[in-house]
Amino acid sequence: MTDVLLEARNIGKRFGGVQALKDVSLTIRRGEIYGLIGPNGAGKTTLFNVFTGLYPRDGGEVMFSGKPLTLESPHTVAAAGIARTFQNIRLFGNMTARENVMVGRHVRTRAGVFGAILRTRAERAEEAAIRRRADELLHYVGIDDRADALARNLSYGDQRRLEIARALATEPQLLALDEPAAGMNATETVGLRQLIEGLRKDGLTVLLIEHDVKLVMGLCDRVAVLDYGEKIAEDVPDVVRSNPKVIEAYLGTSAH
């Protein structure tokens, strides 16, 4: 088995007359934390959205686990083994933390969300298993004591953790995190870093978009940098940190 989990080749994306991505190629290896950084408007979120099926690509191809990834929709991408969180938290506020995770888990069930409503014996047994798994994931991210709380009543940091738990419920091979530290205080950011390090320790591959450059440089195994839709660097943090193009485009002194 190759150690490359995701390979993007010459990805292009236009919005009207704007070339948002220009022949971007990169590789993400199994079991690593891969960071994607760059200034505002560099194309990070666009590339992220291409990988997760929100945007169709205008050129290039994506290989995932050795097979072409069609990227037809977020559902097909999730079924292939890629889960994501969003910069703007997207939870069901009127559902409990446990219920939010259970919704994510239904992607991997035989019955699906609607089948569970029928409540046959098989569906009831499966629903009980989903509930147990949801509780395990809430414990994993450290908010099992809030399982019965409505998502809207959780603290901001706990909502971030809940979104990660829901993504993990789909059993992804690749977890894509979009600005997970945004809005967090210093204590919450430390906890987030420990959680992501735990994911890597347990063998999960993580793609991280994050404006907190120090977090990225201290956490990621490798980092790619985009600028004006082009990749200008891809290497281990120490090499990227000292790259003159990167310093000029984005980092300045913030990575030191």
Give the location of each predicted region.
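Glycine-rich phosphate-binding loops of nucleotide-dependent enzymes
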Residues: 2-256
